């Protein structure tokens, strides 16, 4: 994957997150600032999904933990085999919102 494809892929992920949160009626605010996408929950807690361009990785940080994902076989996968969408669902649940990104 080249740099342009990397950015396009992550921006598509961000769009999908925002659309799913809105469609499922979650009480959150989403914001993008440069390479950082932030989901802010009603209690002001946050999930941060950000680009790590030098590594071509996608990072996820929340009170559920921090994860680094590489794009393999058309999906974002952590070194331990966890899938990005599953980790994001678990992170949202830890912040009080049940969301299905599948």
Swiss-Prot record:
Segments forming a coiled coil: none
Cystine pairs: none
Keywords of the record: Iron, Metal-binding
Species the sequence originates in: Histophilus somni (strain 2336)
Pfam families: Frataxin_Cyay
One term under GO cellular component: cytosol
Similarity-based family: Belongs to the frataxin family.
Family matches, as PANTHER family: FRATAXIN (PTHR16821), FRATAXIN, MITOCHONDRIAL (PTHR16821:SF2)
GO biological process: iron-sulfur cluster assembly
GO molecular function: ferric iron binding; ferrous iron binding
Signal peptide: none
Protein name, entry field: Iron-sulfur cluster assembly protein CyaY
Functional description taken from the UniProt entry: Involved in iron-sulfur (Fe-S) cluster assembly. May act as a regulator of Fe-S biogenesis.
The keyword Iron is assigned to this record: yes
Classification of source organism: Bacteria, Pseudomonadati, Pseudomonadota, Gammaproteobacteria, Pasteurellales
InterPro entries for the chain: CyaY, Frataxin/CyaY, Frataxin/CyaY_sf, Frataxin_CS
Domain of life the protein comes from: Bacteria
């Amino acid at each position: 994957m080249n740099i342009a494809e990397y950015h396009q892929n992550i921006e598509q992920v961000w769009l999908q997150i925002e659309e799913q949160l809105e469609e499922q009626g979650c009480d959150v605010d989403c914001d993008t600032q440069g390479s950082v996408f932030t989901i802010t929950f009603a209690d002001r807690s946050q999930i941060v999904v950000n680009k790590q361009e030098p590594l071509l990785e996608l990072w996820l940080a929340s009170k559920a933990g921090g994860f680094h994902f590489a794009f393999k076989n058309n999906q974002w996968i952590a070194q331990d085999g966890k899938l990005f969408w599953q980790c994001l669902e678990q992170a949202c649940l830890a912040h009080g919102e049940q969301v299905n990104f599948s």
